[in-house]
Amino acid sequence: MAELLDDHPPTTTLPTVPAAPEPPPPLDETARARALLAAQPVTEGHTELPGSLDPEDLPPVRAAEAGAQLWSLHVETDEGVIGTLRRIDSVRALVAACPEDLRLAYTTSELAHARNCGRVAALLGPVGWTALGGSAATLRAYHALGVRAVNLTRFDRFARDAVREMNRIGLAVDLSGADPDTVRRALAVTRAPALLTRADPEALPDDVLGLLGENGAVLMVTVTDDPAAVADVLDRVRAQAGPHCAGVSHTTAPDAGYVPLFAELLRRGWTAQELVGLAHANATRALRETEFLSRTNRIRPAAA
């Protein structure tokens, strides 16, 4: 028996498994905001163009996180249709002169393609209401030239017919600067989501924000160097209209960009999905639905 015990093989010692490495510390809100915006560039609803349209002034100063811009085509009232046509012509020529920076986009597919190519997508519009000359034919001409939004600021019989024509041909209805009653009346007619490219939610009562939410409209809010104040405005839009209605107009502090605002919203509990919507997905969805309605619309053209 002693011999059997002596012949027993020695016990095998198992190798020590190294401890799992400590997970990296979570990113703070600023780092998370920066990473999100790097992957999801902002679509800005309102880009002011220099009055001279000198090539040296373009492309317009923008935040580093901007991936697409709607270029305002507003002109002085006395310039009317002719002034707007000249502006469209000049803008198209200047975008063509900046191929490394800009690319005109006429559809949401072209918008996405421009961004994927590292260019800022430039969308023409909105055109000012006074530049229509009270004519549906002018609407159609602007659309043929690439304009994709018109700013409706009052509501009368022509406005009702114009909204229907805009739905038919695929022009977004921009309600920036319209009083609450005009917004209500326009929303009762349009079948496509409205845009407010220079939204002032503080000027709109809760019931109007609710109607905008039902419409799927996008309120594009100006970003300033006070992210907490802007976040307060966006929190109200989120609460009354829904997170699907929040968007960005432009920033008055392009050097700071959008990271401070998005970091503040993360601290307030906004989800990554909601912030992607704010950055660009909500605006893209509204434009895409406007395009789709135009393709499926069977409304007869409005009288000129």
Language model regions located:
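N-terminal hydrophobic targeting/anchoring segments and the immediately downstream early-domain regions
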Residues: 2-158, 183-185, 189, 202-304
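Loop-centered beta-sheet repeat module
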Residues: 156-197
